[in-house]
Every structure is written in C-alpha cells, then in structure tokens.
Amino acid sequence: LVMDSENKSSSKALSTIKSLLFALIVALFIRYIFVQPFKIPSKSMYPTLMVGDQILVDRISYGVGLPCSKSKIIPSFKEIKRGDVVVFRYPKDLKSISCPNGGFVGLSSIYYIKRVVGVPGDIISIDLNDIYINGNLISKKIPKNYFLDGVKHNVYINIFDQGKTEVIYSGNGNLLGNIDSLVVPSESYFVLGDNRDNSMDSRFWGFVPRENIIGKAFLIH
C-alpha cells in the first residue's frame, strides 16, 4: 500500500512537470514565432506611441524568412504597405553581415519601430523638411486610421526586449539632403518616425531591407 501510494505521487509529479514543460514550450513558440512584446523607450513615434507604451508585434503576417534568402519558413499572407508601423533590425548595425547576393542582414538586438511611407517602386523626394511620395506631400499630421489598435493618445519608439533597449543615435547624423527623385528599390522600404523632427529614420540611413523587418505592431497595452 505504501509503495502504491508513492508510485501514484511520483506519477502525479511527473505528469505535472510534463504539463509545465509543454506549456513553456508552447509559450516560447508563440513568443518567438507568432507575437513578440516590445516596450517604447523614446519619442520618435510620438504621438502614436508614448514612452513606456508596450506593444505586441505580429511576426507571421509578413512571413518568416531565412537570412539572405527569399525563401520563407512561414509564407506571408499580408503585404507590407504604406502606413504600417513596423519593428525592424537597424539596417546599418555594425554587426550586420553581407549577403552573397548583395545587401545585408542585421544580427544584433538593436531594433527600431517606424512607419512605412515608401514601398518598392515609390519615388521619394525631399525638400528641406518636406517629404514627397510619388509627388504627394507627406503630412506631419497622422491620419486617425493610421493609429494602432489600443492607442488612446496621439507616436515614437524603438524597442525593448528582455532588457535590451533601442540605442538612441549618438553619432553625428547626416540627413540625405535634398533629393529630386529617389526610387525605393525592390525588397526595400522607406520609413519615418511620426515625430519627424526628433527621429532617426530613412532620411539618415536609407532604406530598410525586407529581411530586416521583424513584423507589424498591432496592439498597445
């Protein structure tokens, strides 16, 4: 009777451990494949995102790809479009690696969050602080339908993940200067912070390669 009781206790404990391990694996799978949380440490996306806001990033809508390859582990079912707020690896990171077919992939934990304003094929023009996409002036006022779900205030950020925060640019940034017409290349995007006067974005370091984009921000909580 004593042995039988001990066996039942051991079996119950083992079952509990297995359940906890399974739950942990599922949580990690969701965390690294489906959604990822980030915390806003700066004001580059103000007034859409405020310092301290926590957001969730959809990692699968754009597909999950392989570095330096157009192949995808999970195929995309949504296109990256103008107005999307995206999180991406800093394209000029010193830890980036060159790809055999050209371009580069960021490897570090430095992430940025900005709004996509130019997609492949768009023509970008810059005249002082005025930016034109295909001849249309990009307003500094963010349209209401561009706000993220859950936003209760008018955005800026970049990111936080397991204690790692986005590095606010500390070097001497140089704007691209006035540009008559710059065509957004294939598999690349032109991004801006909503707080345009206080944002390091494509005006400073150029286009964001498709493979650097982690996902789309979809919820503030």
Predicted segments, located by residue:
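Soluble "head" domains of membrane/secretory-pathway proteins
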Residues: 2-14, 29, 33-34, 38, ...
